[in-house]
């Protein structure tokens, strides 16, 4: 079996079929010449298909063990297309600490179409079992989750969902296929914000989806073409180029994050650290079972919640910005940034405190990052 280190470089369509170019070219075209009336070639119109996008779609399917991949103009565009599989009256079980943008899409947009949902703590499998209704069609979650780094048991949740004839939809953005393989653990559909680790350089907005079901692939393909939120050829090329270095990047992100999490845990200025690589993390054993490393995301709380503003503004290498997964380190406060769309009462109920801080640990020199954090904590 080919190693993922090799697959990220040689997987999917890694060379151009027409010219043999070792980097698939950017086919910057909207339409394609046909052989004659009623005689289209493989591609007709770039909303329906484009060679550069197709190469990326084949690659994500290969990396995740899917039968077909789909590239969208953003992660949320991909989520929207997948959730459009469901109809009025259908019920979706949604992880309670899901990304704010996903929550907003479901709560403010999809409910208008008649879809219903419940937020459930999926780390409690009994709560999950109790949440199923006759109308339940899917369970949707991230693992590790954003921003609380909750680790959910993909195999167990998938098994429970299958017993209720429901699909398992896993957002694998934080782990990437390099660290975690949801389809192999029972998931039906895997989603990514490729803006993050897959692109890896904070220079592209993209979404990727894959499935292990030929039937679902046909439906998702229809929705991708019908909704039309497809990824352009230039952005497709950028994501494919980013994926080529996914292996060394994820190893570096994970190694740096582990040391930084341990540093924060030992600091008197920090009251709590959320990182799956710490042995006292609630999901540590599950993470060890289903991940090959623990990733580059850390969340934590300061002992003095009033010191958050000064802390985040006194860092040199951790840039205050939304998003994550680039080679550079970023810092944000979810309650006022990425998760502001979730009502305050609900945020507090699920544990996203106003003072929670999230780090996207980059691949810079570890000693520089540690010094930066140490000095900022001391300036509080």
Curated annotation (Swiss-Prot):
Pfam families: Cys_Met_Meta_PP. GO terms for biological process: cysteine biosynthetic process via cystathionine; methionine biosynthetic process; transsulfuration. The modification N6-(pyridoxal phosphate)lysine is found at residue 196. It comes from the Bacteria. Transmembrane segments: none annotated. GO terms for cellular component: cytoplasm. This is Cystathionine beta-lyase. It catalyses: L,L-cystathionine + H2O = L-homocysteine + pyruvate + NH4(+); an S-substituted L-cysteine + H2O = a thiol + pyruvate + NH4(+). Keywords: Amino-acid biosynthesis, Cytoplasm, Lyase, Methionine biosynthesis, Pyridoxal phosphate. The lineage of its organism: Bacteria, Bacillati, Bacillota, Bacilli, Lactobacillales. Disulfide bonds: none annotated. Its cofactor is pyridoxal 5'-phosphate. Its EC number is 4.4.1.13. Coiled coil: none annotated. GO terms for molecular function: cystathionine gamma-lyase activity; cystathionine gamma-synthase activity; cysteine-S-conjugate beta-lyase activity; pyridoxal phosphate binding. Pathway: Amino-acid biosynthesis; L-methionine biosynthesis via de novo pathway; L-homocysteine from L-cystathionine: step 1/1. The enzymatic degradation of amino acids in cheese is believed to generate aroma compounds and therefore to be essential for flavor development. Cystathionine beta-lyase (CBL) can convert cystathionine to homocysteine but is also able to catalyze an alpha, gamma elimination. With methionine as a substrate, it produces volatile sulfur compounds which are important for flavor formation in Gouda cheese. The gene is metC. Its main location: cytoplasm. Belongs to the trans-sulfuration enzymes family. It is found in: Cytoplasm.
